[in-house]
Amino acid sequence: MRYTISEMASLLGVTTHTLRYYEKMGLIHPEVNEDTGYRYYTVTDTRRFNLCRELRAAELSLEECRELIGAPTVEQSDAMFNHQIAQLRRRQVLDELAIRFLEHKREQYRTLEQNAGRIWVQNFPEMWRLTFSQEEAADRDKELQQEKAEWLECMPATRWVSRLPRRVMEQFRVGRNEYDYGLMIEADAARRLGLKRTKHVEVVCGGDYLTTIWKKDYRGSFGWDSLDDLHAEIVQCGFRAVGETFSSIVASREQPDGSIVNYHLTRTKIYT
């Protein structure tokens, strides 16, 4: 059985453009009538084409497909399959973490207004942190920028989080409200995703944090008012010591007058 390009496209449910592209890539090799220039395809071509489609559905590249239907050694095919299996398993982890993120985000949106301004103690797991800016001025270190790119590929498991040093709460309203900006991820998730704990990565201790949702309804930089409620609670409770403070956006809403309100989860490490 021989097919014209139109017949093969109809049979396989693809366009003639796709078949021409696969031929150009060396994935299929139709017979060419030297007199007419017409291309004719056989069952050999349909089977090779469909094998490539299956491999593409598993997210192998066309270049990898070409190698796999060429003459790879067992070592070469093993390497390509193992690499893709590892990539898909990592994707599974990312998908699982993304689902968990969305479930948590759904609950945050449900309770947003009732938690705004409320203060509670919440236990957080150990985290990894990659810091790459002092306030909003980014560090230009090339190694750090490469790590930043790798971490950004892991969103939403990685989150953008501001960090304030412990002296901000210990010397409240003295000097500037300083912070650095970076990405954070649960330590267990980082290990599952294969992120490396390099010299740029810090470990943020888990445990109890005094927590609130703060509403920022102005466009300027963060002021001391963002910490007023937490600091008042710290003073009232008389904790033995406090650690660093972390803040990340959890929601944003546009108001009837067009102004924007951002909701920030802000937490301070406490030692009781």
Positions of PLM-derived features:
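Short, charged amphipathic alpha-helical surface segments
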Residues: 33, 50-53, 58, 65-120
